[in-house]
Amino acid sequence: MKALPLAKMAAAAAIMLLAAAETGRATDAVSADDAARFLAGMPPSVQSPLTPLTKDPAWQHHEKFLDAAFGQLEKRQTSKIAAWAAVNLAAPRPTMFYMFSGPDFLYANAFYSKATTYVLSALEPVGQVPDLTRLPRGSLAPGLSDVERSLGSILSFSFFITKKMKTDLRAGEFDGTLPILYVFLARSGKTIRDVSPVTLDDTGAVHSGNENAGRNPTPGVRIHFAGGDGAERTLYYFSTDLSNSGVRNSGFLKFCARLAPGNSLIKSASYLLHAGNFSTVREFILANSATIIQDDSGIPLADFDPRKWRFFPFGRYAGPIDKFPGRYQPAYAELFRRSQPMDFGIGYRWRSFESNLLLAVKVP
């Protein structure tokens, strides 16, 4: 007679244990924001499953390294860019386009902090951030070193070195652009709300990661985040070929057209927009931008219609670096004879005394 109540009690206990296990799994899930803070060398939330990992000497070294690097960058560059933008960008559009960006949200935000939608694009794959609580034993230290190495050139020189990035962003546990986007979002004071894989079909429509986007899908990621003001913002990154043949076979520019007009940033772009096989993207930027901020690796001055654009040059035009011979622009040199001073460096000539920046504003 007593066996029945005991059986019921055992069953009830089993159900409670299962429920507790499920609750534990839900509680133990690492949020995207905590993962971003951890990768950025910033403490995650107190209740995060990642908090115990911050006691690892490898993470503590990572924290000190990035604190110093971003502290120097803020003092030397990003705070000055933000001050420049506050003075010179009177009425920024809600959308900003940053072609050939790689994962460089850092400078997208520095120049256009008031944007509500950021669209970044480059060849580099989206990648992923693995479950940081389930990394193989001994892989945390080399993984964090990979992140530091991937950030090295942009923290020192303001741009990613493309060939080096191809290697760094495919190495180790943290592959692709997403881990670096996480770092820049966290270090820019953003709070990540949601991260989801997306694809574009050939009409430019956005599909969630598991939906069929047709024959020529463009892979990407959509990140919803909030700034210090609490306002919701969206960052898109798409891995796509921006050459004429590439954009002809994708819906990327059609997607961008739905968000146009916007503001554009072009820097350290390997002078690709000087070439004929990137004319489609060049023409799109000119047609769909209210303002363009660029160094001389962007759109050649000869491709701007002077009846439609006003030019505001800053800094000093010293010509292209030796790696890009034949890209000197006499018209650029003439324009920059009347330039305004600039107290930060940008682009391939990253020292402030030899950097150039052109603000082009479309005539209403």
Per-region residue spans from a language model:
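Conserved helix-turn-beta segment immediately C-terminal to the redox Cys motif
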Residues: 121-125, 186-194
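Non-globular targeting/processing and membrane-anchoring segments
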Residues: 27-153, 233-364
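Bacterial N-terminal signal peptides
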Residues: 10-19
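Short, surface-exposed basic-aromatic patches at helix termini and helix-loop junctions that form
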Residues: 89-90, 178-190, 212-213
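Short, thiol/selenol-centered motifs that function as redox-active sites or metal-ligating centers
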Residues: 101-112, 157-179
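Sec/Tat signal peptide C-region and signal peptidase I cleavage site
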Residues: 22-26
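Bacterial N-terminal signal peptides that target proteins for export
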Residues: 1-11
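Short aromatic loop motif centered on NTY/YTY
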Residues: 169, 194-237
